[in-house]
Structure formats: structure tokens, C-alpha cells
């Protein structure tokens, strides 16, 4: 939806990419900027992030930004194990990466709220929360890579 300017894309390809297999954009880092985001949307995102940190991923400040760069052979294994197809699919990928010991690096971005977003605040929040529980259940007995 172009909520991040395309000219920021080169920042995802970092010099240490040999030891970083996933680079994600974050709206929560100190130098990040959010432009035009309504308070209710921001609140919804922060509440969801608290749930993500409690149920799935502790060390990532913004799993839902949408800008992610995947490199390395091991990343293919993550997508083979992925089962969630909704908005929480990337939380599942990051959850699996964390369990596999794959390094995830967050970078600050300038992010623009797009009113044309397809997110339905109430329904999608409930579905994404349900997906967090599904992620935990689906991968409860997975072995590490």
C-alpha cells in the first residue's frame, strides 16, 4: 500500500547481511516516524504488540509494520512451516525465526498511514489475536531446525 516510501528500500540490504537473515522495518524505534496515523489505529497496534510480546515474540518492537526482507537458506524452512494465512502470518514467521535462532534486525522507517488500508479494526484485531493462540498451539511440538 506504499505506506513506506520506496526510496527507503535500500536500507533493508545491510552490510552485515551474512549474519542477518531477516531485516524488518519498525515504526517503534527512536528514529522512526509515523505520519498521519489516527490515535485509535495507533492504540490498536500497541495493544496487539503487547499481546504478541506476551504470547509469541519478546524481542521485536514492531511485528506488524509489513516491511520485511528475508535472505539466507534457512528462511525457506520458515515458510515451509508457516500455517497462518491472515494478517498474523508475519508474526508466525518471526516466531519460527526466533525459535530457530535466526537473527532479526529492526530498522527505523518513515511510515505513512494509508486511509485506504484494508484492515477492519475490530474484526481483524480479534482474528489476529486468535491467530496468536493458533501459532502457539500449531508449533507447540515442533522441533527446532
Residue ranges and their predicted role:
Residues 58-59, 81-85, 94-112:
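Catalytic donor-sugar/metal-binding loop of nucleotide-sugar-dependent glycosyltransferases
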